[in-house]
Amino acid sequence: MTQVYNFSAGPAMLPVEVLRRAEQELRNWHGLGTSVMEISHRSKEFMQVAEESEKDLRDLLQIPANYKVLFCHGGARAQFAAVPLNLLGDSNSADYIDGGYWAHSAVKEAQKYCTPHVIDVTTHDNGLTGIQPMKQWKLSDNAAYVHYCPNETIDGVAINEQPDFGNKVVVADYSSAILSRPIDISRYGVIYAGAQKNIGPAGLTLVIVREDLLGKAHTALPSILDYKVLADNDSMFNTPPTFAWYLSGLVFKWLKEQGGLGEMEKRNQAKAELLYGAIDRTGFYRNQVAIANRSWMNVPFQMAEASLDKLFLSEAEAQGLQALKGHRVAGGMRASIYNAMPIEGVKALTDFMADFERRHG
């Protein structure tokens, strides 16, 4: 059987060790004779899953004690609404950094609840898209918070700086970059992330929120999106997505076994450098992102002859290189190389790219 490597942007590849363990435990979890999917979320057995997964996540990200960790429903799109409704308070304005598709999507949702001050930080130089340094961002004085997206999956644009905005409340959509490298949680008021890229399967959403920001929700906010309600109920205000939570917990343990986020950073940098090196080697492939803002997680690329895209994708699929088609908004190709993607998968892709260029270049 051909070795398959899944380059999907999300739901994305999971570590094979995690899948094997889940397979082994699927029908008889911890000797209970049932699956973890079938037990009560309030049982002592699942409470152990919840407690261990939070502890492991806190260890990985070095989350300070004055932050709550919430395991939620709804994906990042639910957080596009939850953030303003939890954080605006008496204000009607928030700063939104527009650096790409998902940042702009957050703006559109926020417009239902406030008047966002939208700050376009993109640059376009010699056909390459980049991001202004944070010190050039023109933040307003009275915004309730500053929202940005550190990694744009569609455009392959990353903001690698850590924010240093004084006392401003910083909110970040880390859906596609969480756990890929160490970050300083204390610089943020809220971090949220859909699980289906670098955490686990779809259905779970992670929120990390500083405690002093709780209790400010709009009165019309649905309870299921209220950070204080979720925190007071240990993320069990209603039945959580237990299987996704369990699998994410296994991923956290896998990350610790691999050496933590420092090791992930080294691996992810090596994978990205290998792939971008293959793209830049000749003019056959192109990436249109400024080098300083190239994503380690999502690598879009095009060919000089777009008519070859369909052939490239079909031949890649035949060789076990799956889900390389670019997003419908951007076209071309895109390789998502999250934590679970081994460097062997990236090497298989770059070898195929070189062979395809030799035959069609």
UniProtKB/Swiss-Prot annotation:
Protein name, as recorded: Phosphoserine aminotransferase
Sequence positions that bind pyridoxal 5'-phosphate: 76-77, 102, 153, 173, 196, 238-239
Gene3D superfamilies on file: Aspartate Aminotransferase, domain 1, Type I PLP-dependent aspartate aminotransferase-like (Major domain)
Gene name as annotated: serC
Family: Belongs to the class-V pyridoxal-phosphate-dependent aminotransferase family. SerC subfamily.
Keywords, ordered alphabetically: Amino-acid biosynthesis, Aminotransferase, Cytoplasm, Pyridoxal phosphate, Pyridoxine biosynthesis, Serine biosynthesis, Transferase
Catalytic activity entry: O-phospho-L-serine + 2-oxoglutarate = 3-phosphooxypyruvate + L-glutamate; 4-(phosphooxy)-L-threonine + 2-oxoglutarate = (R)-3-hydroxy-2-oxo-4-phosphooxybutanoate + L-glutamate
Cofactor(s), names only, from the UniProt record: pyridoxal 5'-phosphate
GO BP annotations, alphabetical order: L-serine biosynthetic process; pyridoxine biosynthetic process
Manganese among keywords: no
InterPro entries referenced in this protein's UniProt entry, alphabetically: Aminotrans_V_dom (IPR000192), Aminotrans_V_PyrdxlP_BS (IPR020578), Pser_aminoTfrase (IPR022278), PyrdxlP-dep_Trfase (IPR015424), PyrdxlP-dep_Trfase_major (IPR015421), PyrdxlP-dep_Trfase_small (IPR015422)
SUPFAM superfamilies: PLP-dependent transferases (SSF53383)
Pathway: Amino-acid biosynthesis; L-serine biosynthesis; L-serine from 3-phospho-D-glycerate: step 2/3; Cofactor biosynthesis; pyridoxine 5'-phosphate biosynthesis; pyridoxine 5'-phosphate from D-erythrose 4-phosphate: step 3/5
GO molecular function, one term: pyridoxal phosphate binding
PANTHER family: PHOSPHOSERINE AMINOTRANSFERASE
Residues bearing PTM N6-(pyridoxal phosphate)lysine: 197
Class of this enzyme: transferase
EC number(s) reported in the record: 2.6.1.52
Cellular compartment(s): Cytoplasm
Subunit relationships: Homodimer.
Cofactor binding note of this UniProt entry: Binds 1 pyridoxal phosphate per subunit.
Record GO cellular component, one term: cytoplasm
Function, in words: Catalyzes the reversible conversion of 3-phosphohydroxypyruvate to phosphoserine and of 3-hydroxy-2-oxo-4-phosphonooxybutanoate to phosphohydroxythreonine.
